Amino acid sequence: MSENRADPQFREDVLAGLRGPRRAIPARWLYDERGSELFDEITRLPEYYPTRTETALLQSCRADLATRVGPQTAVIEFGAGSATKTPLLLGAIDPAAYVPIDISGDYLRSAADIVQQQFPALKVMPIEADFTQAVALPEEVGHLDRLGFFPGSTIGNFVPRSSVDLLRHMRDILGEGAKLLIGFDRIKPTNVLIPAYDDAAGVTAAFNLNLLHRINRELEGDIPVDAFAHDVRWNDMQSRIEMHLRCGRDVRFNVAGEAFAMQTGDSIYTENSHKYDLRGLRLLLRAGGWTPLTDYSDANDWFTLVLAEAAPLYAAP
């Protein structure tokens, strides 16, 4: 039985993306269980600086965060993944509850179990959901102060307009008086950026190509995966890394009963990763309904963590 019955949005997004003149599939579909495993492996690669840089920042700013956030809050993590950096935050601020939200259910539950083992007294309440859509938080956190946690520069996977919408959406979920700790990858030389998304071991390539395997498996596709290659580009005008799946020969294939053709050199656009300077990330946060309180950057200015507060909402006169 095809698995697309359980996720019609995947089918809709893939078919729409393959039909268009500029083929593109939303990046969130890279993260099935296998994709999440591969991304976790990516974060440990020597070329992939964001994870180790952000981890070091979390370690160095623990005391300041504890003072600014305070104990007995509810930590809401958007796109929790393997939650490898989360214990650093939880250990620093002594929260009352932890609510990880992730689209990959099995991966989410495994990560939640690990956090629960590390913090036995903490209420851990995982939510399997797409955090870009409506999410209802557990009633148990309704009376608590809330800290949103969005590490890993995931905000960069969205175009600026969508980033603003997402930040406003997070503000709606977290509510008045909430705070947000969010990671931003900074603009830097391409000799650092490109290898982070095109590693020598080929793990990022496997992560990107896994999308085609997922389409074949879940949408009754027959895409010849070996005809495609991982392709990474730096778009200087947009200050972003772009990931594509480039076609190496003319191919014809079917997905969900629909026929498609691609020529040599055609590509499927699979992911953005926008990079920011300090001014740009602060403007983005303000546009999204958040007031920056403080930020933490490494010595190279490769990565920045920002602690922000929900800006007041003013009723129309």
Which residues fall in each region the model found?
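Conserved SAM/SAH-binding beta-strand->alpha-helix loop
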Residues: 104-106
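N-terminal auxiliary segments of SAM/dcSAM-dependent transferases
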Residues: 1-29, 36
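Conserved beta-strand signature within the Rossmann-like core of class I S-adenosyl-L-methionine
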Residues: 173-187
